[in-house]
Amino acid sequence: DNDTLYITADTLKSISKPRQKANNNPEDSTKLIVTPAPPTLPDTIRTFYAYRNTRILKSDMQAVCDSLTYASSDSIFKMFGTPVLWSDSTQFTADTIYLHTKNNKITQVALLQNAFVANKVQQGIYNQIKGKFVDGYFTNGQIKTVHVRNNAESIYFMQDENKAFSGMNQSRSAAIR
């Protein structure tokens, strides 16, 4: 999948450095010699920084934040400064957002401090979850499971088999799964 990711910001910075690999010294087993690995593509750690007015655009998600970092070693986008992430019809906000990816697809989103998730059911109706921390897990680009920790609250609109709204569930707990 050659889906392109676009990132804009006032300042962009990219750093590449070779991974370090350890070699044991056969003459002295108490010594560990660390030498730089040759700078081949798979052995290079790439770190990317975006500062001020950062925007991300991809076919399956968009995001805005003040700044972000990304490291190829763990494939996590770390967004800071009032980050907002949109994926499909779901909006995620928190003080900090960690977006985990694998093979260019979102696998997990971690919302740290003041986490809030809103999912549009139809015009003017949103299922909502909030808490101190929220972890969302994705399958095939769609959010499938959400775990809320510390001061968890949710509002969920129930629908019958004909998609007619049949009620609203409001919950509060220490955690919601």
Regions found by a protein language model. Give the residues of each.
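Structural signature for solvent-exposed beta-strand/loop edge elements and short helix-capping sites
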Residues: D1-R177
